[in-house]
Amino acid sequence: MQWYIDKLPALEHVTPILSVCGDDCAVCPRFLARTEEELHETAVFWYNAGWRDHIVSNEEIRCTGCGCRPTCSFMLLPCTREHGVSACRECASFECDKVKDMYIRSDEKKKQCEKACESPEEFLMLYRAFYEKEKNLR
C-alpha cells in the first residue's frame, strides 16, 4: 500500500492506541485510511494478506477502532462487554481460551502478510499493528 508506506516515517513515534485484542490502531491501515483510494488499497491488501476471502467494500474495510462494529473477528469485543471490562487484560479470566485462540489465529496469517507487503519496513509497521498482541496485552 503505497499510501501507507509514504506514512511510515510519521508513524514510527506515534503513541499506541490499543484495541481490545492488543492491536495498535495508531499504526493500522484500516484506522488510518481516509480517502476512497486508500480504503480500496487497504481492502485489496487485506485480501492479499489472507485476512479476507474477497476484496470487501470501502465501507466494510473502514474502521474507527473497537466499537465501530457490533462484533470482531475474534469475538473479544462482545466478551469484554459481557465481563464489564474495556480490554481483555483487565478481565479476571485473562488469558482465557478465546485470547489464546486469538494469538494462534493471528500468528497463522503472519507469513502471508509479510509476502503481501511491498517492503520490509511496511511489514515491520504491520507487525507492530497486529503481531505484538501478547506484549500489548500484558
Predicted region positions:
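Cysteine-centered metal-binding/redox modules
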Residues: M1-R138
